A protein has these predicted regions:
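Phosphate/nucleotide-binding beta-alpha loop and adjacent structural elements of enzyme active sites
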Residues: 1-222
């Protein structure tokens, strides 16, 4: 089996990996699934995914909700401000937050399939407040791309052929907060297909500091 040790050695030989990231990951094997074979994963993306799996995570007060984990903060409750960017057709995370904390969740996703899904969801208008807008580091009408390899729409134009596009309005996080009447965020979740880092840099520049951030970091334009 071609292990991660082999991959890291190859990367070092070609000068594309910093030695300090080694440590305990060297003996971890890489296993492949059918999804790996038929999807266009880059070499760097697989290395990042395998490395992240080795990171130590504090499990104290860590609670799983749907596909994500958060710190089970006693301050979270019915009055908490919770933003969830990137809905798709799965709101199990948001549903469990509502059940556990009795809170309202503000959900955002401009993709057509998500708009239809949320219009039909029983919690929309009750504990869910849904807006069909995207979040970005600038305001404007933007193009979303669907990769040939499948997955979700992304703001980043893929290197490979796309099979669909659509235009949607995007706002910055501070604009969304202002229009919603919020000055702070207790929990921010972003699963926005490679666009999270620019948003987080914009947050840093503007001094937006949520109490908790749950973010999925993808390699864009793959």
């Amino acid at each position: 089996m071609y292990t991660l040790r082999d991959k890291v050695s190859d990367a070092l030989d070609r000068g594309i990996l910093i030695p300090k990231v080694l440590g305990s990951i060297l003996s971890r094997p890489i296993t492949f699934s059918g999804r790996d074979i038929f999807s266009r994963f880059s070499r760097s993306r697989r290395l990042v995914k395998e490395f992240v799996d080795t990171l130590r995570t504090s499990t104290e007060a860590l609670a799983s909700f749907g596909n994500y984990s958060i710190f089970d903060d006693e301050n979270l409750g019915p009055d908490s401000v919770i933003y969830s960017f990137g809905v798709g057709t799965n709101v199990s995370f948001d549903e469990e937050l509502v059940t556990h904390y009795g809170c309202r969740v503000h959900l955002f996703d401009p993709t057509p399939v998500s708009v239809v899904y949320m219009e039909q969801h029983p919690l929309t208008g009750v504990n869910f407040r849904f807006e069909p807008v995207g979040v970005a580091d600038r305001e404007g009408e933007m193009t979303f791309y669907l990769r040939f390899a499948g997955g979700s729409y992304t703001l980043f134009k893929p290197k490979w052929r796309t099979i669909d596009t659509f235009q949607a309005r995007c706002l910055t996080l501070d604009q969304i907060m202002s229009s919603s009447g919020h000055s702070n965020i207790d929990l921010l979740k972003m699963d926005i297909e490679g666009a999270a880092l620019p948003v987080m840099w914009d947050m840093k520049r503007k001094g937006i500091r949520p109490q908790q951030i749950v973010v999925e970091l993808e390699v864009p334009a793959v």
